[in-house]
């Protein structure tokens, strides 16, 4: 009898796929006398950087996380079932690279960046890609005996049970070049942001723009867009003022040989003459807030005062039958946590250190009622102008009536300068940025509360998806302060103009005038109406299963082998989230009948809605959830190589309710800490 070769396929070889590969190696190494396993790595782009972090992209594109807070390796903080095999963070690797520890042959620009990169410096995306490429080489070259790898530089277009295998639960992956990988024991989907087809409203808008002969650039990663279609002097609207906006802005200015210099401490832009005339707008009308300068080091974080893991577990148990309501059960805790840090830091900044700690105790003890918290604030002499106001922070122009574009631009420049000054105060010493950084630090706790149906469906859609997630992005995941300084300089140089809030954009076909264009205006800024020749959607494609442009997910959806995650509401129906449905950890893929597949796993961006903020990267020293997830998936996949599908934990029909959010918080299939023997 011929022994069957054991194999695993990892689809997507960016940071998440790389983490799974590292965990496969670590867990395989810990097995006593394991049988050989071959790993197929499928990605049309180089493994490690993948598409998003490829090393040939513009040096003007930056990460929005500092170098000391970026890693792909496990560390002592991570709650692993598998073995710990630490490696360097991005900054630690850069120090070693700059010192010549990795030999010769590295490009001069990479060595130069390595030598100037500090732990609190924002690296270029291409440099992070070099780190990921090195990490992939380290992981695969140091793999244990018996674990081998083959890379396939193609898209995966289909995943099916293998009809030719003796055990027909084994898997078959078909690639775009018609290669078929059969007899697979496990397949792990580690995809990132994927292309998406336009919805009905977007299709109608695009069709009208095309009919008028207008240029319209759809949502995309700015690094992938050919901006040569925007010649110098073209009037263009960047619709969106988030992170993608800053990427486009950099490529259309510094990327076209414009330069910045310091003049009397102020940043000044010197145009090259090759820039388009840039206009920008969004619903909020102002850009994401600048990140506070990091004072927390690589591993520091705000430790929860109210939203602890224990409290979340109690809340989920109490509301297990109905699901939590974000506004009622979670937002009061999040908001008080942020406010407490703001006032405590404000008092500390004024020299009242002892009083600041007592204030924290009193404010937390006051409970959620504003009458009580206002009394505490007044007792500590905090005046009205220093009071925390969520609505004003979300809409800082709330109390303004603008008289025209010049008035709005003047106000905006003052707002941006104040934001930069607040960022320079730091994320520990500065009251505003210290408070906003709490939102970033609480992401893991919020995930514990909302993941896997923690909220009822109506609250997920209305409170989390449409309200808190965009607010959190605006307040806590913005660009480095330098980017906002550059924006100020570009406005002052006349290269950039921001239209205003609640922008309206329409296609004017030119009937009667002979000149087509986009008309743009803000109802809050009188006289803001203008016309542009081109429109760039400055955002990433939607995360959507029903409209995905990925051929693999389209195949799985069309054949009923995957389904959208549905979250129960407090009525008889469920909210269709349009995210990819998976079980609780280790995240087995669920089919249209609600059955988890014993040999298929998925995590990352396509599972948004099962999990929250899936695009967040791996951070060292804070028990990164991505690392614990990849460890659990790798262990489950290795169990598949040693066990018949019928005995794989979690393979039975008992998890079929996972698509309606009824699986337990933090639930997972058994993965024993020692070895990989399946649980019984």
What is each of the regions a protein language model found here?
Residues 1-57, 111-643, 647, 652-654, ...:
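Flavin (primarily FAD) cofactor-binding/catalytic cores of flavoenzymes
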Residues 47-110, 597:
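Redox-cofactor-proximal catalytic regions of oxidoreductases
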């Amino acid at each position: 009898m011929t022994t069957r070769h054991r194999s695993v396929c990892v689809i997507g070889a960016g940071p998440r796929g790389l983490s799974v590969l590292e965990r496969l190696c670590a867990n395989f190494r810990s097995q006593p006398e394991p049988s050989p396993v071959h790993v197929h790595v499928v990605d049309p782009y180089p493994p490690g950087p993948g598409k998003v972090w490829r090393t040939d992209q513009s040096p003007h594109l930056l990460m929005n996380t500092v170098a000391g807070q970026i890693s792909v390796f496990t560390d002592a903080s991570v709650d692993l079932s598998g073995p710990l095999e630490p490696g360097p963070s991005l900054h630690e690797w850069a120090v070693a690279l700059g010192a010549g520890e990795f030999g010769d042959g590295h490009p001069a620009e990479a060595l130069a960046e390595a030598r100037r990169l500090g732990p609190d410096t924002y690296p270029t995306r291409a440099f992070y890609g070099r780190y990921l490429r090195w990490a992939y080489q380290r992981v695969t070259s140091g793999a244990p005996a018996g674990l081998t790898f083959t890379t396939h530089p193609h898209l995966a277009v289909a995943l099916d049970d293998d009809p030719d295998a003796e055990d027909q639960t084994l898997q078959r992956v078909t690639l775009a070049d018609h290669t078929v990988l059969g007899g697979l024991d496990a397949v792990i989907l580690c995809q990132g942001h994927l292309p998406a087809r336009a919805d009905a409203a977007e299709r109608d808008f695009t069709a009208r723009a095309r009919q008028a002969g207008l240029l319209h650039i759809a949502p995309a990663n700015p690094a992938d867009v050919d901006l040569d279609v925007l010649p110098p002097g073209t009037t263009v609207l960047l619709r969106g003022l988030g992170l993608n906006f800053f990427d486009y802005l950099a490529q259309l200015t510094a990327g076209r040989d414009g330069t910045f210099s310091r003049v009397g401490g102020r940043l000044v832009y010197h145009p090259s003459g090759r820039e388009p005339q840039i206009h920008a707008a969004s619903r909020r009308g102002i850009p994401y807030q600048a990140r506070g300068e990091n004072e927390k080091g690589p591993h520091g974080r705000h430790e929860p005062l109210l939203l602890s893991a224990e409290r979340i577990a109690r809340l989920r148990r109490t509301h297990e039958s109905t699901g939590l309501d974000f506004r009622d059960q979670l937002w009061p805790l999040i908001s008080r946590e942020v406010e407490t840090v703001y006032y405590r830091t404000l008092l500390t900044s004024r020299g009242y250190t002892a009083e600041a700690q007592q204030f924290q105790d009193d404010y937390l003890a006051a409970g959620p009622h504003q009458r009580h918290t206002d009394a505490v604030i007044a007792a500590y002499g905090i005046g009205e102008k220093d009071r925390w106001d969520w609505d004003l922070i979300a809409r800082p122009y709330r109390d303004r009536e603008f008289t025209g574009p010049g008035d709005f631009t003047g106000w905006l420049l003052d707002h941006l300068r104040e934001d930069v000054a607040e960022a320079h105060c730091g994320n520990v010493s500065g009251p505003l940025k210290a408070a906003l950084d709490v939102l970033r630090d609480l992401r893991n706790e919020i995930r514990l509360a909302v993941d896997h149906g923690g909220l009822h469906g109506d609250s997920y859609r209305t409170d989390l998806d449409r309200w808190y997630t965009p607010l959190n992005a605006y307040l806590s995941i913005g660009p480095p302060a330098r980017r906002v300084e550059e924006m100020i300089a570009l406005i002052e140089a006349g290269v950039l103009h921001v239209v205003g809030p609640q922008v309206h954009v329409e296609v004017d076909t030119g009937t009667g005038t002979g000149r087509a264009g986009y008309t743009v205006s803000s109802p809050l800024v009188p006289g803001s109406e203008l016309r542009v020749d081109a429109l760039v959607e400055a955002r990433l494609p939607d995360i959507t299963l029903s409209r995905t442009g990925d051929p693999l997910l389209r195949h799985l959806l069309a054949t009923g082998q995957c389904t959208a995650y549905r979250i129960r509401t407090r009525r008889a129906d469920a909210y269709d989230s349009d995210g990819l449905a998976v079980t609780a950890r280790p995240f087995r893929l669920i089919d249209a009948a609600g059955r988890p597949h014993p040999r298929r796993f998925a995590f990352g961006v396509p599972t948004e809605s099962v999990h929250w903020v899936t695009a967040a990267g791996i951070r060292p020293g804070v028990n990164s959830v991505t690392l614990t997830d990849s460890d659990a998936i790798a262990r489950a996949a290795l169990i598949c190589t040693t066990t018949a599908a019928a005995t794989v934990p979690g393979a039975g029909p008992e998890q079929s309710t996972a698509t309606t959010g009824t699986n337990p918080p933090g639930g997972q299939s058994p993965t024993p800490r020692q070895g990989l023997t399946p649980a019984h």
